[in-house]
From Swiss-Prot:
Interacts with PDR17/PSTB2 and SCS2. Phosphatidic acid-binding protein involved in interorganelle phosphatidylserine (PtdSer) transport. Linkks a PtdSer donor membrane (via binding of SCS2 and phosphatidic acid present in the donor membrane) with an acceptor membrane (via its interaction with PDR17), forming a zone of apposition that facilitates PtdSer transfer. This is PSTB2-interacting protein 1. Signal peptide: none annotated. InterPro entries: Alcohol_O-acetyltransferase, Atf2/Sli1-like. One of its GO terms (molecular function) is N-acetyltransferase activity. It holds the Pfam family AATase.
Amino acid sequence: MTTFRPLSSFEKKILTQSLNDQRNGTIFSSTYSKSLSRENDADWHSDEVTLGTNSSKDDSRLTLPLIATTLKRLIKSQPALFATVNEEWEFEPLKQLKTSDIVNVIEFETIKDKEVNCHWGVPPPYLLRHAFNKTRFVPGSNKPLWTLYVIDEALLVFHGHDVLFDIFSAANFHKLFLKELNEISTVTHSEDRILFDVNDINLSELKFPKSIYDSAKLHLPAMTPQIFHKQTQSFFKSIYYNTLKRPFGYLTNQTSLSSSVSATQLKKYNDILNAHTSLCGTTVFGIVNNQRFNYLKSIVNQEHICLRSFICGIAMICLKPLVKDFSGTIVFTIPINLRNHLGLGGSLGLFFKELRVECPLSLIDDELSANEFLTNSNDNEDNDDEFNERLMEYQFNKVTKHVSGFIMAKLRSWEKNGFNDDDIRRMKYDNDDDFHIQNSRTKLIQINDVSDISLSMNGDDKSFKIVSTGFTSSINRPTLMSLSYTYCEEMGLNICIHYPDSYNLESFVECFESFIE
């Protein structure tokens, strides 16, 4: 059988982690519709909706034949979508793909059921838990590295394996699917159960995604530093009164529910399906509507704020009331999309660099910060509330400057050293379990930003459009939480806070929400 190529060292590391129940991909959902007008959120719990049944126009729904026709066109042009991993740990093409190999259909009897389970176009929690905790890929199984859930003929949920689909690939899948969906004829929908047959294509004419982690150095253009400057006092006044003055509980000392598994020895394949692990914790999705998001973007643009640094700053400030000991460290793991730098556009595959930004909790320690703040500002404010507001602003400024400066230093190092820099070596060779053991006082927070990937397409009223999106990745120790966000023109910014069930972070979620609002 013809193979594409062996797995690279980094891809082998990822597959090993997957087999050891340490990760299980990314789930990215999008709602497709031909109408941009959405029902008022207040209508979804009405009696009429409760009693109503699903009754949209046939041509505006993603029927199974329509999905099959779109997938047939898409799969044959994207080798990543008909690839698997054999027992020799090589990527190879599948001989055939059936609809049942990929597509899982979920239907609800009423619109009420649909809205309760899939409000704002995000996947229901039970689906996330099933996909992350119950589905596993085994090399040599002749199974694809992705699957698709179709909910109520409107919501498509893509689940891609980490070995071939990074978070940006998950977003790009929907971009590619939408393009093919709007190019097919409305009268040629396929009832064929066969989506792909290797005999119908010429493999030599297709390019399978290469591994960039074992390649030569990559030189990137220099970037302008994005440093956070002083923010308006009224902005922080609202944050202070609505969040930090409220009483909070404390972070529990429990560890994740994920079982402790040695990464030095692979499990037997027949044990994998019976493993009791939790790669899906508590997920909270929220929407920043366009009006609010545009306001926040205006602040970002005016003050030269890096959005990732801004989110890191929010996370640190919202964690402050939960921290007992400020001698520890928060490490933000931030994947950076390399496709534009490599001229790969909206391609599938693994084309990212992960940065790890260490933020000492001392940056948000009031005792240390107050002395620095008074020394630097000569502020002798008598009003405690106003002083605390300005102190929080000072801490937020420090965190954002620290994160931005670190990111810029790492990108400059990468521009100079290419794939021989420390971050790439860490991605390829470091053992994450060793990191957890050696840094027991350190917690990881994933910042997953795909907001720069546009999922909109210019089209007429007869074209399908993506009207809402949401995503998250699997989570395990030593990750405290992940913050994943994506942007859709119709809905706005969708943010998912994902944390292990053993952590009590409801107060953090409330604080984060108030901060954004």
